[in-house]
Each structure stands twice: as C-alpha cells, then as structure tokens.
Amino acid sequence: SSHRILSLGCNEVPKAGGGNYWEGDQNDARDMFKGDDPNVIRQREMVADLVLRLRNSSMLARKYQLKDIKKLIDDILSDESENGISKSQIMDTIEFGRVVHAEMNAITEAASKGVSISESSLYCTTFPCHICAKHIVASGIRRVVYIEPYPKSFAISLHSDSITLDKEKEDEK
C-alpha cells in the first residue's frame, strides 16, 4: 500500500497503437468529429429489427402493418412517456459505443506499461457499468470507490460472486 497513482483513465475513443485521441491529434477520429454515435445508431437498428420481426409475424396492429418502417421507428422512439420504447432497456445498451470508459482505459493503460494493478483500489466518479466491472474483477482490483450510483449497471447481478457493496463482506470476495 504505497498510496501512489498506478494509472489514469478517461472516457474517450481509443486509437490504433494504444491510448486515446486527444485535442490536436492529427486524423482525430473521435465521434464528435465523425458526427454520429454508433451506439445510438445500433439502438435504433435493434428497435427496427424487433419491429420488423413483429410486423413480419403479423403481431403489429393493422394500422402499423403498412406504415413506412423509418417513419414507424421515428414515431415509436419519439414517445418519451414512461411506457415508451425510448425508456426501455434496449435503449440502455452501451456495448456498441466506441468510447472506452475511464475504468477500462486505466486498466489497459496500466497493462500497456506493465504496471500490476492487482490488489489495488480504483477511484471513479460513477459506479462501474457491467462491462467495466468484468474487467475490474479480472484485473484483480480489490476495491472500487465511487461517488455517483449508476442504476443501469448489471455489475452486481452479473458478478455477485466477486462484487459486494457491503464493506463488512469486502474481505470475503
């Protein structure tokens, strides 16, 4: 326990050869310069796939059977009510974004430099998502300290054998 920083990470798009794109990089290919978010595009494609399958199985109401699919998806996703598809779990998917979360960024940065993070602590702003959680567990990080909860994370349910929120049980896992 030397109380030193082993690695740092941030939420950013990775670049070939390691690391991330930074302001001023030549050929900066971050999403903000590409003009789209691949995760949002993929969420829309998943909704369209589901609606098309329902349509092809004659499971959509008659008034939706002949409607243009693009217009139908626009209408479906524009419903911001609690029961609308825009509030569904399918719209919470994060797997298709290009951005590497800060936790994974710090883990890969340490690995690329040959720095062991086993038995270390990770400090982050938000409770880790389920994707980061599996990397945290696999890398041997012992403790995660966070400020904000992240209710959409499935980290606890997917890794209940390895993750606990109860400080008293921390030494058991």
Predicted segments with their positions:
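Zinc-dependent deaminase catalytic domain
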Residues: 1-173
